[in-house]
Amino acid sequence: VTTTQTAWKPHLTDLTLLTGRLLLSLLFVHEGLELATHFAGAAKAMTALGVSLPLLIATIALQLGAGFSVGLGLQTRLGAVALGLFCLATAALFHTNFANQNELLHLEKDLAIAGGMFVLAVAGAGEISLDRVLNGLVKRRQQDRETVAALIAAGRPLSVGEIKLPF
């Protein structure tokens, strides 16, 4: 096994982070799609709860945007913090009837999901993520720039295909 093969071999930690991200994001992406595809009914139900139309639209955007962010591993930390705060707000605003066992259960679930999101925000997406792919591309571009700058500084011509560049 070469060093390159070892570097690309996913570790259990990364597979666990991927699985956790996908499971956590599923809830938000599904709910965001449900609200968006049944918008009229969702607007009516949310209005009855005192939620304005702009807040409903923001909720859908947050659930879909941050949900995909966490699931794909793109700006995962930001998406996880946003969804964690959303869960805390949802728990505090909508699940306050502690005498009702169902409401108490929803409060506890929202708090647990928020906790998971905050742990994910600290842990990051792991190696199996778009963040990793994009960071790798940025690092390669920086290395290419440094190589070109070093060649220019050394006075060596650069060649691109058959064309020689004099700088």
Question: What do these predicted regions represent?
Answer:
Residues 1-37, 44, 53-65, 71-167:
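Extended, low-polarity transmembrane helix blocks
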